[in-house]
Swiss-Prot record:
HAMAP family registered for this protein in UniProt: Mmm1
Residue stretches spanning the membrane: 23-43
Entry GO MF terms: lipid binding
Keywords for this protein: Endoplasmic reticulum, Lipid transport, Lipid-binding, Membrane, Transmembrane, Transmembrane helix, Transport
Record's protein name: Maintenance of mitochondrial morphology protein 1-1
Cytoplasmic side: 44-389
Stretch list, region Disordered: 283-345, 360-389
Species, as recorded: Yarrowia lipolytica (strain CLIB 122 / E 150)
Amino acid sequence: MSQFVLPAVASEGIINWPFLTGFMLGQFSVGLVLLIFVRFFIFSDQTEPDINTQRRTAKVLPTGNPSTDAILEKTYYNTKTHQPESLDWFSVLVAQALYQLRDEVRGNDEVLERLNEILKSDKLPGFLDTINVVDLDIGDAFPQFGACKVNKDESGDLEAEIKVSLEDTIKLGVETKMLLNFPIPKFASVPVSLSVSLVKFSGTLTVAIRSAFNSGEANRVLVSFAPDYELQWKIESSVGSTQKLQNAEKISRLIESRIRRWFKDRCVYPEYQQFELPKLWRKTSAPPPSAGAGTGTSTGVPPSPFPQPANPSSVPKPLELPGGFPHRNMSMSSQRPNINNPKFIRSMSVNTRPTYSSSFYEMQGTAGSSSGSAVADEAYRSLQTSPRR
């Protein structure tokens, strides 16, 4: 049996300490490795962000506004040497859209009605009556776009300049009355007919996109015309009913100056028209509170589809027969209960004489009849004389 003795113990009983020490250190190192593996690979905390993910996010989502020089460099566009481009394809697209619009407007009286509603305003001067649109012609020619070129403005932002020209006859005819409010309101009136036609327009259209980086505002498209535009009008007027004043030059100049001022104050640089671009990614908002919040209807129980009475006490109760016997369909049935039924007679107390009120007979249409009282008395006497079981 001595050959099966552990090598750590010598035959003389002396312990081999170097071997035992190495064996214990090996077991301890294996346990330590297993503990580290379980702690940091199996039960590791996943709340800390990954550094590599942050680096990838920083590369995908730039934080600053890309400079115009970088955009021009990556699109191989030089604002100084690049030649103006033709926009014939864009002119064709606009022509198709205008053709569809004109096809819908022609022969549609709703357009004139809509224009009349717009012109019916309380802001009209007191010497003018209601303005009615009597003629509308949106022309048959199409605008031409060309000579497009991208430049830098004074602040360094990019903007596109496009030449626009249109030669057509776009006509709007209206009728109204000039009122004389002295000595009383509408003391006299003079009919006035006016026709305004756009004959020619040419100018330089400027289009710019203003981005709103790192702000809650939406991106905008700014549209304006250069001050060196050309605008030609044809104005026809008629004043009076019997003796008419045709095409007064003073009236034509007055109307044309008003139209030019209106256009300049809204569409000519430095003034502009702006349009917001829709956002591709919108922030999700919290759902609105339920309509029944605070009223007891948001508990998950659906409301009854049937109308509920405002006062529950006003609901009619089922009628009761004399002696406390309810009749289920008494409120809906027109049949009178059979008092001579043996089951009905046996169910009544022997020592109690039923009392039939007048309302019971009123409901059945026999109020105050002697036949009903006679039947009740006969039933009571039969109960008194019948032997008890």
